[in-house]
Amino acid sequence: MATLLTTDDLRRALVECAGETDGTDLSGDFLDLRFEDIGYDSLALMETAARLESRYGVSIPDDVAGRVDTPRELLDLINGALAEAA
C-alpha cells in the first residue's frame, strides 16, 4: 500500500508552497481552519495540490482540488486517491 499523507507532511507542503503568512501558526491544530482564514489563496492551494500529486504519484483534477476548503479536506482527498491507487 502507498504511504499515506500525514498531517506533518501536509503542513510542510503548505509552508513550502505558500510560506509562513503574517501571524499564521500552522504548528497547532490547523486541519479544520479554512484556507482563506490562514491566508492561502487559490493559487497557493493549487500549487500545494500539484506538489502533493507529484510527490505521492496521484492525480487530482484541478476542479476537484480547487473546491477543498480546509487542510483536512485536502488531506482526505490525497489519501483517498492513494487508497484508490493501491
UniProtKB/Swiss-Prot annotation:
Pathway: Antibiotic biosynthesis; actinorhodin biosynthesis. Pfam families: PP-binding (PF00550). Coiled coil: none annotated. One of its GO terms (molecular function) is acyl carrier activity. Disulfide bonds: none annotated. GO terms for cellular component: cytosol; membrane. Residues 4-82 form the Carrier domain. Acyl carrier protein. This is Actinorhodin polyketide synthase acyl carrier protein.
